[in-house]
């Protein structure tokens, strides 16, 4: 679970998400500032963990979930007629379907995808390791709390797709706009691929492995922040793995709130719209029979898709990285 401070901050932000949390933009790593890190598909135990299902939409990502439909974050925008590029092919947006209970948007395209991502339909996201994909900002200048390294500000945007890992530690109610969110925290012990999100990572797909393969469990939505080293001024967006002594903006009280200097690091993190709890809405949009000219799955993949489409299964940047603007990730 996240630290007590992180949990209380996340809940406080949940009450004000619609007013603007920082949206996400780019995958930022604890282990390295190398902008070329993790810019090719994962291999080994992470092979086929979602890279093959990432498309480009409005400068962010979109993820095919059916022959003629892809899933994205609503807050990044878009219009009918705009292009969606997937697997080297450009498709045209034909219609939008917005979820009234979350930040999700389903986009229908002209044409048919050769493959699409299976959805996670279970209820065991918490504790699961994840792989997340996004375009956006790299790691910038170091942030210190006194003499202690706390994290890094958001850097520049190189527009390159990257991937990272983390663990889902909680689900959080983000309020009427954002709905149910998966929460992952940025820590010093997250391994070589441990990451946070930033501006440009919004709409990035979050995949987990349920034992039968990698499934789409979330769509990147927002991040904790912004932060400050004092209680005045505009502050800054950052990936912070130890927020002790720093200030974080409280959208409810419209003031900087200092994070206590306790004995343990206070991690902050990112949020993704929880896909599983919106399964019935997704199923209401996607036709019960596949539409398109290319067979997408066979075997277990087809069985899983059939469960979703027939209704037998169960299921957060245009901006700045995860919950930004105080919060969403665009």
Residue ranges and their predicted role:
Residues 66-67, 71-102, 112, 125, ...:
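Catalytic-histidine neighborhood of serine endopeptidases
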Residues 299-321:
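A cross-kingdom C-terminal cell-surface attachment/processing module
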Residues 62, 88-97, 117-119, 167-170:
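Short, surface-exposed loop motifs enriched in S/T, G, D/E and P with embedded aromatic residues
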Residues 103-107:
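Short beta-strand micro-motifs in enzyme catalytic cores
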Residues 2-13, 19-28, 272-273, 283-305:
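Short, threonine-centered small-residue motifs that mark membrane-proximal processing/anchoring sites
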Residues 27-53, 60-77, 163, 195-291:
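C-terminal subregion of chymotrypsin/trypsin-like serine protease catalytic domains
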Residues 321-330:
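Cytoplasmic C-terminal tails of single-pass
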Residues 110-200, 217-243:
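Chymotrypsin/trypsin-fold serine protease catalytic domain
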